[in-house]
Amino acid sequence: MAKIGVLGAGTWGMALARMLSNSGHEVTVWSALPQEVDELSRTRRQKNLPGMVIPDEIKFTKEIAEACQDKDIILFAVPSVFVRSIAKTAAAFIPDGQIIVDVAKGIEPDTLLTLTEVIADELNKDGKHGNVHYVAMSGPTHAEEVAKDLPTTIVSACEDQAVAKKVQDVFMNKNMRVYTNSDRLGVELCGALKNVIALASGICSGLGYGDNMRAALIIRGMAEIKRLGLKMGGKEDSFDGLAGMGDLIVTATSKESRNNNAGYLIGKGKSAEEAKKEVGMVVEGINAIPAALELADKYDVEMPIVFAVDAVVNRGADARETVDALMLREKKSEMTK
């Protein structure tokens, strides 16, 4: 049995907390919202996972120290925009040598750091966290399916494979198959940037385009992500694997995907703000666009789909005309790097 602290009580955090508790682990969940802690404790329900019953064994707390101290694993499951502030708050209670697992997906716009890098950057400021182990968990994983115990696969990525395997051992069960990977950077880049491509897929569906276009966006979108990722030092296998192509497929095609759904609404004529409001949950693809653009510029990588999404989502470009412009770009070989 492992002792696990979960920071964040959203759909993903609670789906994983339930799964881990049902596997026999001791789970403590913290939320920054006191009223959310009270509601979860009282109802044993997560409002966005209406069919899921929260096990009585899961403990909820309003004190972040209680979720961080004396834990085998601390799980960061908060929206990307809050990762740094929560890491800063938690730092005083996280011991050196701790295993930290991040399941949020994103890139910090101001620093262009991945989220495990953001946590490390914050913890390293006091000079007391030089031996913390950082693991990125990512893959084709809708919280709604994990909450229903449907078969799911995910990647545990850490340079230290002994740590990656320890996390694999804790998270793996008959419904969750966990693979290890040593390419934490590549896995995190896939998780963040695929959300932008999923927006593109949704926009095209909203415009009434078909499966041909969606397939093209998935393949060419991953080509863009891979071009950037390889220049940044990621490993090619990561982009072709579960955290790369696997996650992109599910995010760009599923009706459960917030990014796909937000894109669909934008394709139907809604503004980005209207789409986010209607989806009702964080749309990480919109948050990831500025960092994606900066990284493309910094590493001199051509990412036309990402730039097209930015034009439609943030600059008021006509979606149909933007697709036409993509289709009429200069002729190229598919093998162009």
UniProtKB/Swiss-Prot annotation:
It is an enzyme of class 1 (oxidoreductase). It is found in: Cytoplasm. Catalyzes the reduction of the glycolytic intermediate dihydroxyacetone phosphate (DHAP) to sn-glycerol 3-phosphate (G3P), the key precursor for phospholipid synthesis. One of its GO terms (biological process) is glycerol-3-phosphate biosynthetic process. Its main location: cytoplasm. Belongs to the NAD-dependent glycerol-3-phosphate dehydrogenase family. One of its GO terms (molecular function) is NAD binding. Pfam families: NAD_Gly3P_dh_C (PF07479), NAD_Gly3P_dh_N (PF01210). Its EC number is 1.1.1.94. Keywords: Cytoplasm, Lipid biosynthesis, Lipid metabolism, NAD, NADP, Nucleotide-binding, Oxidoreductase, Phospholipid biosynthesis, Phospholipid metabolism. NCBIfam families: PRK00094.1-2 (NF000940), PRK00094.1-4 (NF000942). Sn-glycerol 3-phosphate binds at K105, G139, T141, K194, D247, S257, R258, N259. The gene is gpsA2. This is Glycerol-3-phosphate dehydrogenase [NAD(P)+] 2. One of its GO terms (cellular component) is cytosol.
